[in-house]
C-alpha cells in the first residue's frame, strides 16, 4: 500500500487488486459534506493500519461517509465502507443494478446534472454505465477505466476492446472532450501512475486520434 497526500484534504492510496493482479488507485477527499471515497479498496496488507487511519479521519470530519463509484467493476470495498461507517453508496443510474449486485445496495443512483457530495461532478462517457468525476476544489479528474496511465507520465484512453460493441475510440474521445473545458490540473487514474501536474495537456494528448 502506497499513500500519497496530493493536496490539503486530497489523498490517493493504492491497494493490490487480486482480479487485476496489480495495484490500483483509490481517492480520499475531505469535503463540507463529509468524507468522500472514490472507488475505495481496502488493502490486503497493512489492513489494520489502514482502518485505524481511516477511522481517525472519519471521526475528525464528524460527518457522513460517501462512496462514489465510477463504474460497477470498481465497486471494490464499497460494501465494507457501508457496513463500517453506514456510508452512502453513489453510482450512475445506468450502472445501478450491476453495482448493487456487488455491494448489496446503491443508496444514491444519480443521473446527469444531479448534485453530488462536496460539489463533485459526474461526467458521462461513451461507456453508459461509467462516469468520470470532477473534483473542482482540487482541479482533479478521477476516471475509472476510460482513462489509464500511459506509462510515460501521461494518460491514454482505454483499449477499444473495453468499449461497447457499438462504440469506437472516436466516440469515447468525443464523450470526454467536454472535460477539456475544465481547468484540469490532475488526472487521478485508477490504473497506473496519476498525473499530478499538467493534467489538461495530458488529457488533450490522450484524446488525440
How would you describe each model-predicted region?
Residues 2, 17-22, 34-45, 121-209:
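Metallo-beta-lactamase
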Residues 12, 28-30, 134-136:
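Short, well-ordered beta-strand micro-motif
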Residues 26, 51, 55, 176-177:
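Short hydrophobic/charged patches on amphipathic alpha-helices used for structural packing
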Residues 7-14, 117-121:
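Short, hydrophobic/aromatic-rich segments at coil-to-beta transitions
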Residues 75-124:
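Hydrophobic, well-structured mid-protein blocks that either form specific transmembrane helices
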Residues 1-5, 28, 113:
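Short, exposed beta-strand/loop patches in secreted or surface proteins that constitute
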Residues 44-92:
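Active-site metal-binding motif and surrounding structural segment of the metallo-beta-lactamase
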Residues 46-47, 75-78, 97, 130, ...:
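Short, well-ordered alpha-helical microsegments
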Amino acid at each position: 500500500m502506497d499513500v500519497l497526500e496530493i493536496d490539503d484534504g486530497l489523498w490517493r492510496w493504492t491497494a493490490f487488486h487480486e482480479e487485476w493482479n496489480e495495484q490500483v488507485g483509490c481517492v480520499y477527499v475531505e469535503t463540507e459534506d463529509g468524507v468522500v471515497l472514490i472507488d475505495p479498496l481496502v488493502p490486503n496488507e497493512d489492513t489494520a493500519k489502514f482502518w485505524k487511519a481511516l477511522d481517525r479521519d472519519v471521526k475528525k470530519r464528524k460527518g457522513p461517509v460517501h462512496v462514489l463509484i465510477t463504474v460497477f467493476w470498481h465497486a471494490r470495498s464499497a460494501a465494507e465502507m457501508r457496513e463500517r461507517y453506514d456510508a452512502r453508496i453513489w453510482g450512475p443510474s445506468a450502472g445501478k443494478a450491476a453495482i448493487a449486485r456487488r455491494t448489496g445496495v446503491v443508496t444514491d443512483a444519480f443521473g446527469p446534472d444531479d448534485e453530488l457530495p462536496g460539489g463533485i461532478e459526474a461526467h458521462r462517457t461513451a461507456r453508459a454505465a461509467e462516469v468520470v468525476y470532477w473534483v473542482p476544489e482540487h482541479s482533479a479528474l478521477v476516471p475509472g477505466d476510460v482513462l489509464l496511465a500511459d506509462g510515460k507520465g501521461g494518460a491514454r484512453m482505454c483499449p477499444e476492446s473495453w468499449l461497447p460493441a457499438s462504440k469506437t475510440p472516436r466516440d469515447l474521445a468525443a464523450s470526454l472532450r467536454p472535460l477539456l473545458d475544465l481547468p484540469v490540473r490532475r488526472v487521478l487514474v485508477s490504473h497506473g501512475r496519476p498525473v499530478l501536474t499538467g493534467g489538461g495537456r495530458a488529457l488533450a494528448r490522450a484524446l488525440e486520434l
